[in-house]
C-alpha cells in the first residue's frame, strides 16, 4: 500500500507525520488550553516501526489536512490569528444574541426590563451605541462586597 503512495507527492512519511502531530497538539494547547492536549501516537513508549507505519497509513487524510493548513498559514503569515479572531467574534455575537433574547423573554414575562443593570436593550432598529467601559468602583464598594460574601 505504501508503494502506491510513494509516487504520490502527497504521501507523508513517518518523520513528517510525527512533526505534524506535534504541531497539532501544540496548536490545541495554545488555543484550547492544556486540559486535553491529545497524544501523539508516534511518541508512545515502546512503539515499533511497523506500528508507526500502520499509524501513518491510517492517519494520512488528517496528516494531509494538517500539512495543507500549515502551508496556508505560511502563505498568509499576516493572518495567522485570523481563525482565532473569527471564533472570538462569533462567540461574542452569540453571547449578545443570547442576552437580547433573555431580555426579551424577561419583558414578556414581567412587562418591564430587568432592573439588575443600568443598561436596557432598545429596539433593534436603532444602531448599537458605543458602550463605555464601566468603572466598577463607582457601583460597588469593596468592603460592601466583602460583607455580602461573608453573610
UniProtKB/Swiss-Prot annotation:
Task: Please give the function described in this protein's UniProt entry.
Answer: Escorts unspliced or incompletely spliced viral pre-mRNAs (late transcripts) out of the nucleus of infected cells. These pre-mRNAs carry a recognition sequence called Rev responsive element (RRE) located in the env gene, that is not present in fully spliced viral mRNAs (early transcripts). This function is essential since most viral proteins are translated from unspliced or partially spliced pre-mRNAs which cannot exit the nucleus by the pathway used by fully processed cellular mRNAs.
Q: Which InterPro entries match?
A: Envelope_glycop_lentivirus (IPR018582)
Q: Spell out where the chain crosses the membrane.
A: none
Q: Name one GO biological process term.
A: mRNA transport
Domain-related comment: The RNA-binding motif binds to the RRE, a stem-and-loop structure present in incompletely spliced viral pre-mRNAs. This region also contains the NLS which mediates nuclear localization. These overlapping functions prevent Rev bound to RRE from undesirable return to the nucleus. When Rev binds the RRE, the NLS becomes masked while the NES remains accessible.
Q: Where is the composition biased (Basic and acidic residues)?
A: 126-136
Superkingdom of this protein's organism:
Viruses
The main location class comes to host cell
Instruction: Please indicate if the UniProt record lists Chloroplast as a keyword.
Output: no
Which key words tag this protein in UniProt?
Host cytoplasm, Host nucleus, mRNA transport, RNA-binding, Transport
The record's subcellular locations are: Host nucleus, Host nucleolus; Host cytoplasm
Q: Self-association or partners: how does it assemble?
A: Homomultimer; when bound to the RRE. Multimeric assembly is essential for activity.
List compositional bias (Low complexity) regions by residue number: 111-120
Q: Name one GO molecular function term.
A: RNA binding
Name one cellular component (GO) term: host cell cytoplasm
| Name of the protein this chain belongs to | Probable protein Rev
Region listing for Disordered, in residue ranges: 108-137
Sequence motif Nuclear localization signal and RNA-binding (RRE), location on chain: 84-93
- Which gene codes for it? rev
Provide the species name. Answer: Feline immunodeficiency virus (isolate Petaluma) (FIV)
Amino acid at each position: 500500500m505504501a508503494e502506491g503512495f510513494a509516487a504520490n507527492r502527497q504521501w507523508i512519511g513517518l518523520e513528517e507525520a510525527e512533526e505534524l502531530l506535534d504541531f497539532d497538539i501544540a496548536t490545541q494547547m495554545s488555543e484550547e488550553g492544556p486540559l486535553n492536549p491529545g497524544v501523539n501516537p508516534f511518541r508512545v513508549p515502546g512503539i515499533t516501526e511497523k506500528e508507526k507505519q500502520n499509524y501513518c497509513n491510517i492517519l494520512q487524510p488528517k496528516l494531509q489536512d494538517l500539512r495543507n493548513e500549515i502551508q496556508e498559514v505560511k502563505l498568509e503569515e499576516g493572518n495567522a490569528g485570523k481563525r482565532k479572531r473569527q471564533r472570538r467574534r462569533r462567540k461574542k455575537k452569540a453571547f449578545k444574541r443570547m442576552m437580547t433574547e433573555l431580555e426579551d423573554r424577561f419583558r414578556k414575562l414581567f412587562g418591564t426590563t430587568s432592573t439588575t443593570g443600568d443598561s436596557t436593550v432598545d429596539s433593534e432598529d436603532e444602531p448599537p451605541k458605543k458602550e463605555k467601559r464601566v468603572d466598577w468602583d463607582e457601583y460597588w464598594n469593596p468592603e460592601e462586597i466583602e460583607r455580602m460574601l461573608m453573610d
